[in-house]
Curated annotation (Swiss-Prot):
<comment type="function">
    <text>Acts as a chaperone.</text>
</comment>
<dbReference type="InterPro" id="IPR018181">
    <property type="entry name" value="Heat_shock_70_CS"/>
</dbReference>
<feature type="region of interest" description="Disordered">
    <location>
        <begin position="604"/>
        <end position="641"/>
    </location>
</feature>
<dbReference type="InterPro" id="IPR029048">
    <property type="entry name" value="HSP70_C_sf"/>
</dbReference>
<keyword id="KW-0067">ATP-binding</keyword>
<keyword id="KW-0346">Stress response</keyword>
<feature type="compositionally biased region" description="Low complexity">
    <location>
        <begin position="604"/>
        <end position="634"/>
    </location>
</feature>
<keyword id="KW-0143">Chaperone</keyword>
<protein>
    <recommendedName>
        <fullName>Chaperone protein DnaK</fullName>
    </recommendedName>
</protein>
<keyword id="KW-0597">Phosphoprotein</keyword>
<dbReference type="GO" id="GO:0140662">
    <property type="term" value="F:ATP-dependent protein folding chaperone"/>
</dbReference>
<dbReference type="InterPro" id="IPR029047">
    <property type="entry name" value="HSP70_peptide-bd_sf"/>
</dbReference>
<dbReference type="InterPro" id="IPR043129">
    <property type="entry name" value="ATPase_NBD"/>
</dbReference>
<dbReference type="Pfam" id="PF00012">
    <property type="entry name" value="HSP70"/>
</dbReference>
<dbReference type="InterPro" id="IPR013126">
    <property type="entry name" value="Hsp_70_fam"/>
</dbReference>
<dbReference type="GO" id="GO:0005524">
    <property type="term" value="F:ATP binding"/>
</dbReference>
<dbReference type="GO" id="GO:0051082">
    <property type="term" value="F:unfolded protein binding"/>
</dbReference>
Length: 641
């Protein structure tokens, strides 16, 4: 049975882990790093993913895609704030979805995420030495149904069967509690990542990890902290120079990179200098941006964001029926929890210093790997049980446009619940089931996750027909809803899959394209590797020709130089089919020549050895003669020719 890998599909960075011998292992990528930037770049016909994509972002801002997680499963109208912040083009797709426009080719957020997942999949396969087809993928605890479904679709497009969707704070708690499964404790997981914020309250005991409540904000994270710095720098430059950097995509990409770097530096320093030379030319003269940003100024700029974390924490405690004093440990997850003022705020909320015993960048992937091992029946983990919750209430629209809840927020999943409703008018032949997710009393203020009709209701006065509506949430938090007329037995159901905006046919097409692109990426890498190898052979051959010099016979040297010229021409033309043949020809010629040189040297050494033997005999005779000529004086002389 193949391994089930754990993937933390993050807004800013992603990470992959696997269980080996009962221990979680975070797998380094091809660049040797434990985390991979969640960035995809389109460069001509090639795609770059991760660090290579990040390195070229400044010079290719409109085709470098980052923070795609913020668009997953969201309607186009809801992501306008995000669209205003990014340099790449996002347009409206079908079913009010978002699409990334790259030279007229429209990509869904799921497709972009799938490219990142493919990178994670390949990283795991290179490490394990075998194909990987199954994964546990993490999502923010406060992700809604459409966002979870979009994540499952991204996995499917990437060629992965998603065995389980697990909430990020829950995954972190699994990783934290792996060595503490026998202890009874209540923990709070404060997860502030690149684009989302979650707070979950869990109870651990006897190998059971039970989520008591969760809360959060799917549009609050490190990106927002970066953006307050970006706004500050752009405003400073406009105040000093009268120019708006926001109109220049390349300048904004440089500001983004500088803001992220400054934010990180301010976690360990009280001030940092942001120095961006040649940020914008004005009348042919270069303008530079040099600003000193202090930690206190950054905290002032971020004050609203910091305060935004307080209310979800208080709601999570209330939802769990606990107070801050009941919490034994606070776990910090996500790179943004390294910000000192965030740690101070967490200490204020819970009245105790948060634990720093886990790596905030890797712990979620580790937890996902543990969940994968649990699902595969890993005997090393004993009897570990995970009980998660649904983050938001679910219900339907009823008379008066109100939302009637069937499943309350923080209900343990999987869960199934039914309730009976009736008609609002006499002889009503059908009813529309409008499925909603959220906490507001009016239907219009909550999120629509699906609609369907139940037809064929027998004519009857208002209030007589009995319509049984059933909600079923699986372990991934994905919703199915059914409606049944008790009188006729007629039933209609819907699995909320289309809420992410993709049909089965679209997913199939995207999966086929992803497979084809993966093959194209492999071929592109092989092409680059072959050209690099040819370049290396050219360099080494020229070096050896120079080192051997006159030792190489003239005819052999001319032959090698002619073949070398052919290789240079093939390299320039990128004639991959010829390169291997020419390199083999050079290697064979050099091998034969090296053998000849070796044989010639060996023969020379043998001749020298024979001469030395003769010389020794002569020396012995001379010594005897010297004994008879003691009056002869030995002198050194140099023969002049």
């Amino acid at each position: 049975m193949g391994k089930i890998i754990g993937i933390d599909l993050g807004t800013t960075n992603s990470c992959v882990a696997v269980m080996e011998g009962g221990k979680p292992v975070v797998i380094p990528n091809s660049e040797g790093k434990m985390t991979t930037p969640s960035i995809v770049a389109f460069v001509g016909s090639e795609r770059k993913i991760g660090d290579p994509a990040k390195r070229q972002a400044i010079t290719n801002p409109t085709k470098t895609i980052f923070s795609i997680k913020r668009f997953m499963g969201e309607s186009y109208d809801k992501v306008q704030n995000e669209i205003n912040r990014i340099p790449y083009k996002v347009t409206r797709g079908g079913n009010d979805t978002s699409r990334v426009d790259i030279d007229g080719r429209l990509y869904s957020p799921q497709e972009i995420s799938a490219m990142i997942l493919q990178k994670m999949k390949k990283t795991a396969e290179d490490y394990l030495g075998q194909e990987v087809t199954e994964a546990v993928i993490t999502v923010p605890a406060y992700f809604g149904d459409s966002q979870r479904q979009a994540t499952i679709e991204a996995g499917e497009i990437a060629g992965l069967k998603v065995k389980r969707i697990i909430n990020e704070p829950t995954a972190a708690a699994l990783a934290y509690g792996l060595e503490k499964a026998d202890k009874d404790m209540k923990i709070a997981v404060f997860d502030l990542g690149g684009g989302t914020f979650d707070i979950s309250i869990l109870e651990l005991g006897s190998g059971v990890f039970e989520v008591l409540s969760t809360n959060g904000d799917t549009h609050l994270g490190g990106d927002d902290f970066d953006h307050v710095i970006i706004d500050f720098l752009a405003d400073e430059f406009q105040r000093n120079e009268g120019l708006d950097l926001r109109k220049d995509a390349m300048a904004m990409q440089r500001l983004k990179e500088a803001a992220e770097k400054a934010k990180i530096e301010l976690s360990s320093s009280t001030s940092t200098e942001i120095n961006l030379p040649y940020i914008m030319p004005v009348d042919g003269m270069p303008k530079h941006l040099i600003v000193t940003l202090t930690r206190s100024k950054f905290e002032q700029l971020s004050d609203k964001l910091i305060r935004s974390t307080v209310d979800p924490c208080e709601k999570a405690l209330k939802g769990a029926g606990l107070t801050a004093k009941d919490i034994n440990e606070i776990i910090l997850v996500g790179g943004s929890t390294r910000i000192p003022i965030i740690q101070t705020e967490v200490e204020k909320i819970f009245g105790k210093v948060p634990s720093k015993g886990v790596n905030p960048d890797e712990v979620v992937a580790v937890g996902a790997a543990i969940q994968g091992a649990i699902l595969s029946g890993d005997s090393n983990l004993g009897e570990m049980v995970l009980l998660d919750v649904t983050p938001l209430s679910l219900g339907i629209e009823t008379m008066g446009s109100v939302m009637t809840k069937l499943i309350e927020a923080n209900s343990t999943i999987p869960i199934k619940k039914s309730e009976t409703f009736t008609t609002a008018a006499d002889n009503q032949p059908s009813v529309e089931i409008h499925v909603l997710q959220g906490e507001r009393p009016l239907a219009k203020d909550n999120k629509t996750i699906g609609k369907f009709h139940l037809d064929g209701i027998m004519p009857a006065p208002r209030g007589i027909p009995q319509i049984e509506v059933t909600f079923d949430i699986d372990a991934n938090g994905v919703v199915s809803v059914s409606a049944k007329d008790k009188a006729t037995g007629k039933e209609q159901s819907i699995r909320i899959e289309a809420s992410s905006g993709l049909s089965e046919a679209e997913i199939k097409r995207m999966k086929e394209e992803a497979t084809a692109n993966a093959e194209a990426d492999t071929k592109a890498k092989e092409r680059v590797d072959k050209l690099n190898h040819a370049d290396s052979v050219i360099f080494q051959t020229e070096k050896q020709l120079k080192d051997f010099g006159d030792k190489i016979p003239a005819d052999k040297k001319a032959s090698i130089e002619a073949t070398l010229t052919k290789l240079k021409e093939a390299h320039k033309a990128q004639d991959l089919s010829s390169i291997d043949t020419i390199i083999a020809e050079i290697n064979n010629t050099f091998q034969a020549m090296s053998q000849e040189l070796y044989n010639a040297k060996a023969q020379t050494n043998n001749s020298a050895g024979n001469n030395n033997s003769a010389g020794n005999n002569t020396q012995n005779n001379n010594n005897a003669s010297d004994n008879n000529n003691n009056n002869v004086t030995d002198v050194d002389f140099e023969e002049v020719k």
